[in-house]
From Swiss-Prot:
Biological or metabolic pathway of the protein: Carbohydrate degradation
Catalytic residue list: D37, D175
SUPFAM superfamilies documented for this protein: Ribulose-phoshate binding barrel
Gene3D superfamilies linked: Aldolase class I
Record-given protein name: Ribulose-phosphate 3-epimerase
Species, as recorded: Homo sapiens (Human)
Keyword Acetylation: yes
InterPro entries reported for this sequence: Aldolase_TIM, Ribul_P_3_epim, Ribul_P_3_epim-like, RibuloseP-bd_barrel
GO MF annotations, alphabetized: D-ribulose-phosphate 3-epimerase activity; identical protein binding; metal ion binding; protein homodimerization activity
Cofactor annotation: Fe(2+); Mn(2+); Zn(2+); Co(2+)
Entry's family note: Belongs to the ribulose-phosphate 3-epimerase family.
KW Manganese (keyword) present: yes
């Protein structure tokens, strides 16, 4: 089976002038991991930050927090080693951004990180299938990547369901427009790693939102287990 349900706040919607404090606030509120969006202005139109910021966060937050790097970059091969040195735990690259996923997967592992593989909404999930047994996590985007605060795309749920059916032990992450009103759809389809940005970051009580998301996800996982 996939690992248990985990909630990873996306810091894209945080106060970037106080990024370290915002990350600490999320961890203190019960976040299982931090989802860090790296954008280069080429693969997606927005620009965020790179490995120097990740290195600074690692120094401030210590070794315990799990950094899930969502690499929305046109040359993911270029940043594997810098991110590993900076303290990243998982390197999630986009299938659309490389011509040689196998070599990239190997390089990520050799640099001591877990491997995530992401697909945009317009990419068929079957293209991910040949690599599913070589990765730790599949990320199904539920918005067009590049900006936070977008509307959840429910028509991505068949991709999640197909992956869960075909690869029961794979960690499956959803990212984009996920919050209390949409998490049940993701969980019922089979997602066990939930990225949520605005719903958590802008809440006056982020702990309660994180707990709600985790509980919905866990209940759906238990139901799938009983239904088998």
């Amino acid at each position: 089976m996939a690992s248990g349900c985990k909630i990873g706040p996306s810091i894209l919607n945080s106060d970037l002038a106080n990024l370290g404090a915002e990350c600490l606030r999320m961890l203190d509120s019960g976040a299982d991991y931090l989802h860090l969006d790296v954008m280069d202005g080429h693969f997606v139109p927005n620009i965020t930050f790179g490995h120097p910021v990740v290195e600074s966060l690692r120094k401030q937050l210590g070794q315990d927090p799990f950094f899930d790097m969502h690499m929305m970059v046109s040359k993911p091969e270029q940043w594997v080693k810098p991110m590993a040195v900076a303290g990243a735990n998982q390197y999630t690259f986009h299938l659309e951004a490389t011509e040689n996923p196998g070599a990239l997967i190997k390089d990520i592992r050799e640099n001591g990180m877990k491997v995530g593989l992401a697909i945009k909404p317009g990419t068929s999930v079957e293209y991910l299938a040949p690599w599913a047994n070589q990765i730790d996590m599949a990320l199904v985007m539920t918005v067009e990547p590049g900006f936070g605060g977008q509307k959840f795309m429910e028509d991505m749920m068949p991709k999640v369901h197909w992956l869960r059916t075909q690869f029961p032990s794979l960690d499956i992450e959803v990212d984009g427009g996920v919050g209390p009103d949409t998490v049940h759809k993701c969980a019922e389809a089979g997602a066990n790693m939930i990225v949520s940005g605005s719903a958590i970051m802008r809440s006056e009580d982020p702990r309660s939102v994180i707990n709600l998301l985790r509980n919905v996800c866990s209940e759906a996982a238990q139901k799938r287990s009983l239904d088998r």
